[in-house]
């Protein structure tokens, strides 16, 4: 297989093992853990051209490239990462990591608990965005990266980029926060709870210890994903793609799949339930719920951002109702009030929340322009 000139080509996942205990926000301590990660491009001698990509709820470390020549699925942000792409691997050293609690190689509920010899399951502790950032900082130390040229993330990944700028202000030159929010709204917490209930009430869940029973709570995962997927799309986007199209010529007057949108959602749910871990889904949604950096400052986001040193790009999409532009503007206003440097882009799109994964021309142009400036400043 011949790869396009702007592809990172064949890649391989790596694993970093840590035996220094990690104290979590919940009060639990992980004595040892592993992080699965990938890198693209080359770290320069000054070690100042590194970019960290933080993934969203269902993401992972495989950001770009393919694992073998006949691999049909490129990394989840392959359209944005590669030579000559906005996140240009000819100029930057790019790192993608699967977060703690994940199900793609990093230590999580499906990993073996060394204390028992069995999967962690329900015993795996809740993890938070600050916990992830602490573990990512240890990975950065291992890779010889003292300061990121940029930390970039969309949705839950954007929360991590924001947390990086606050927790390690001296280690982040730029933070790109895309389609995100400074905390979840009550409606978003409600969506997450309904999704969790779908999993928790699945008879095959077994209190989180389904591994020992040789089953998977597919029904719950399927419903959780179907609900989530609706919130990632826009009404206009769904209408344009599916409308009221029927799979057959007319109504069947039953409860089987009739509309194309029903078929699409069930396909997405079926696919996801075969790839993702139910306990990880619960952990990721709780990490979303708990993220609220202003909480420690009596709800004052300006005060929470007072120590940041990074320059910011905040980006939002007009049709995103899960993380609406108003939520991004909250971050912008707080940064301005705190006297920080921030650029804001609001992109016209019909793709809803998922637009941050797409290649709408204004979005690509915004990312390219901002990161070109970052690269030029490094070269100066």
From Swiss-Prot:
Catalytic activity: L-homoserine + succinyl-CoA = O-succinyl-L-homoserine + CoA
Enzyme Commission designation: 2.3.1.46
SUPFAM superfamilies associated with the record: alpha/beta-Hydrolases
Signal recorded as keyword: no
Active site: 155, 320, 353
S-S pairs: none
Domain AB hydrolase-1: 49-357
Residues at which substrate binds: 225, 354
GO biological process per UniProt: homoserine metabolic process; methionine biosynthetic process
Pfam family name, one: Abhydrolase_1
UniProt-annotated location(s): Cytoplasm
Coiled coil residues, start to end: none
HAMAP family in the record: MetX_acyltransf (MF_00296)
Subunit note: Homodimer.
Family membership noted in the UniProt record: Belongs to the AB hydrolase superfamily. MetX family.
Identification of the protein by name: Homoserine O-succinyltransferase
Origin species: Laribacter hongkongensis (strain HLHK9)
Taxonomic path: Bacteria, Pseudomonadati, Pseudomonadota, Betaproteobacteria, Neisseriales
């Amino acid at each position: 297989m011949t790869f396009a000139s702007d592809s990172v080509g064949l890649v391989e996942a790596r694993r970093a093992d840590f035996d220094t205990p990690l104290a979590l926000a919940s009060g639990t301590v992980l004595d040892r853990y592993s992080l699965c990660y990938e890198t693209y491009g080359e770290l320069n001698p000054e070690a100042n051209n590194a970019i960290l990509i933080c993934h969203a709820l269902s993401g992972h470390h495989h950001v770009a490239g393919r694992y073998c020549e006949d691999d049909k699925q490129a990394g989840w942000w392959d359209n944005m990462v590669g030579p000559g792409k906005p996140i240009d691997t000819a100029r930057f050293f790019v790192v993608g990591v699967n977060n703690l609690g994940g199900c793609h190689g990093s230590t999580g509920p499906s990993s073996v608990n060394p204390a028992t010899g069995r999967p962690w399951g329900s015993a795996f502790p809740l993890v938070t965005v600050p916990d992830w950032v602490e573990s990512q900082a240890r990975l950065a130390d291992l890779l010889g990266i003292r300061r990121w040229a940029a930390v970039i993330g969309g949705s839950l990944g954007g929360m991590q980029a924001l947390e990086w700028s606050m927790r390690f202000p001296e280690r982040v030159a730029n933070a790109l926060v895309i389609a995100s929010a400074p905390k979840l709204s009550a409606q978003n917490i409600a969506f997450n709870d309904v999704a969790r209930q779908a999993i928790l009430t699945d008879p095959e869940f077994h209190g989180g210890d389904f591994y020992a029973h040789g089953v998977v709570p597919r029904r719950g995962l399927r419903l959780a994903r179907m609900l989530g997927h609706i919130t990632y799309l826009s009404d206009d986007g769904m209408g344009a793609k599916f409308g009221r199209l029927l799979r057959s010529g007319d109504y069947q007057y039953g409860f089987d799949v009739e509309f194309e949108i029903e078929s699409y959602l069930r396909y997405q749910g079926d696919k996801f339930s075969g790839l993702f871990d139910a306990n990880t889904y619960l952990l990721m949604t709780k990490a979303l719920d708990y993220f609220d950096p202003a909480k420690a400052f009596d709800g004052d986001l300006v005060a929470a951002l007072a120590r940041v040193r990074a320059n910011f790009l905040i980006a939002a999409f007009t049709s995103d109702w899960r993380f609406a532009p108003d939520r991004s503007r909250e971050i912008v206003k707080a940064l301005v009030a705190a006297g920080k440097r921030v650029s804001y882009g609001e992109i016209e799109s019909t793709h809803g929340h998922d637009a941050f994964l797409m290649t709408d021309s204004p979005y690509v142009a915004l990312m390219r322009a901002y990161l070109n400036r970052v690269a030029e400043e490094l070269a100066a």
